[in-house]
Amino acid sequence: MYIPDTTFYMHEYAEGTSGGCSIDGVPSFQWTIKRASDLFANKKVVIFGLPGAFTPTCSSAQLPMYDILFDEFKKNGVDEIWCTSVNDAFVMHSWSVDQNLKNVKMLPDGNGEFAQGLGMLVDKRNLGFGMRSWRYAMVVNNLEIQRMFIEDKNPAHMYPTDPFEVSKAEYVLEQIKHSSNQEELF
């Protein structure tokens, strides 16, 4: 299975700025439109999806551990790590600044199209969240999904909080290490 070739609306920020709307009336960012095929072709990446920026588990455990363990992922053949959420580019950028990220790249899925294309878009209106990404991680090699780590989502709409076991950075890294002698992760 291949990842959906979704369009992402992203920002490139001017050198020396931390984002924001403008500097003396001049935007500190430039809108860029990227497709999944532009971002992930000819690379081995880990992409992890989570319910929302600035939420407790996402901010205290999931996102920071991927950033901390980046060098270990790199030693095991991963080129890049991307975090995606059904949030816009402004929110994702502000969250990356707040988290002081050094290694993980942010993938804003503001319309939820990437999550939907993967079957990971869930209805969280019962919690006031609207449509959100389910918590998952995947290893993608040249656009092909080698393995998905999907948290238990049966029934997804009933969870007051989201399960957090198999999409943890530590777990995904161990699975990659364990399969390093195999051609594929399946």
PLM features: residue spans?
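Chalcogenol-based redox active-site neighborhoods
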Residues: 1-186
